């Protein structure tokens, strides 16, 4: 068994050694939950890595979105080059779930686009968890959604070893049952081919390696790993384990049992709908389900097969579905990053999913068992999670309750940077005072971030500052990803001096050039001016050694008092540490990366407009990718009509892209 081994020129410093020791002591004493309070720039990921190395336990790290998960995955991959670091997020580039809008009698079919690379990485993650112990899986919160049963996944695995006998027809049949396709011409991931005494398999978890099985009669003589593009032999293997090309593979007996269960539920549901005098729903459900049953009988699968997952996994109604958590060993370790965001997300996912599916069941589009194809309820996740370390600069109520309010702190930054100075000024005449502060900050060569309470206020303030000839821009939720990057680049370069926003902490801004963060109407209690929001916003000025924060308030609220007191407490600890060790804080100098050319155009295009506005396929693809992100956002917000409109626009643009290419 391989042990975890960090490869890095850095060693734990500042608060890190103490924090690592405290967390490990808590794990050793069987504490189920611990809280690692790490401020921005304190080295939380490096601290997590050292805890993993010291405990030597398989680990799952949950992040609240794909972007953050990818960041952590990249860092862990560089720290643990000799161990299995895997990435497990939703493999959909675009996902429009089935939905029914009763008020317009509109049924929207499921539509999705699967990212092959992410699907490969998901297979690599589950395979690693079943094959070895030195595994780190970095996942988004989507890991609480249903996945194929690990028992069936492992049970159907084909174990190959040289010297063993494998009847040829049986082996080929086993590969087909694993949902591998025979393709003797086009050899790609998830396929196998037969040439004489050789069988080549392209495993589902590889993109650039395949296996060649060399037989003498029924005896397997050799297993060679080779490059599927060049045919070059890369290694000779002692064994090979072939897992399913899908996480939902199952033996024929399981399929037959599932069909019987579906038929039984269908009859009960049809009787119920008839008793409710719902002929349309009765006919619709019978027609749709009978078609699915025919497909299952003939092919072993059907469109939307996941809606029958309860029958395939042998679970009872209401029982939790199998998820990635069932692939983890009993002694696994869990980190929940940015837990103040991740935990509420986990809590909300079940209700959103059930609300949509309940409508489908009520109107005869699905059987009630479709409700069991779902994410875990929060209580189920809480029950299944192994020993857990929550990680956040601003812990939420659940984490604090679970840990009894005890936190392990990471306050000292390796750079020596201090938390910013906080100044409270009256909200009366706040705009006039802000203008004076903007002048002073710009004269020092720094930038300014201003956060307001409403969109109208942000728009008016931006327009007013522009009238006064200040280079000002406005960042809001309708700004698309590439435009947002462009605005931030302009801010860092000095093309923009002032950036106004409503919820800047959500935007995740890290601007080393920011010398001032101004929080208008800081005394208006609510989500945008809560203790957590204020601390996160104050942190935007922590990348600059001269960073300041001004909170405009006519009264001292509990949130302001707690946020400012906490910032001052951290600042004093950091100052004392720097004085003791002779550290001089220095602003972080990060390179400003150039953006590719970006076309700002209206999203409502026809083919002719697409040809006119995009003079090459690359530019058109950029816009198509942007629309896909908008579709994903609309679908996740349950805005199904908008998602369908965007999907129709995409089809037109994709036809144009095909012609352009």
From Swiss-Prot:
Span of domain UVR: 621-656
Known role: The UvrABC repair system catalyzes the recognition and processing of DNA lesions. A damage recognition complex composed of 2 UvrA and 2 UvrB subunits scans DNA for abnormalities. Upon binding of the UvrA(2)B(2) complex to a putative damaged site, the DNA wraps around one UvrB monomer. DNA wrap is dependent on ATP binding by UvrB and probably causes local melting of the DNA helix, facilitating insertion of UvrB beta-hairpin between the DNA strands. Then UvrB probes one DNA strand for the presence of a lesion.
Family from the record: Belongs to the UvrB family.
Complex and partners: Forms a heterotetramer with UvrA during the search for lesions. Interacts with UvrC in an incision complex.
Binding site for ATP: 38-45
Keyword DNA-binding assigned: no
The keyword NAD is annotated on this UniProt entry: no
Protein name: UvrABC system protein B
Motif extent (Beta-hairpin): 91-114
Any matching Pfam family: UvrB
